[in-house]
């Protein structure tokens, strides 16, 4: 099961609240081939699409992701934690 930690949800909400996003725009978890940036995943701003899954925090949608990628990341945890490179989101697959 894909899990988003409380720490990650708090940081996603902080990021979302700090942006002036247009109505209907959200933070999206993207993985290859959609994600072409550094690393194995990224968080981008995008509109909600049919079949998306929403992650809520304090009754606010803080993250969306394609329903079909949940099988690819079904045993993973999205977290926000301190790493040797500083505080960042991590996607740990088990």
For the regions a language model picked out, list residue spans one by one.
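Short, structured protein-protein interaction patches enriched in aromatics and acidic/basic residues
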Residues: 22-48
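Short, low-complexity, intrinsically disordered N-terminal segments
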Residues: 14-27, 56-57
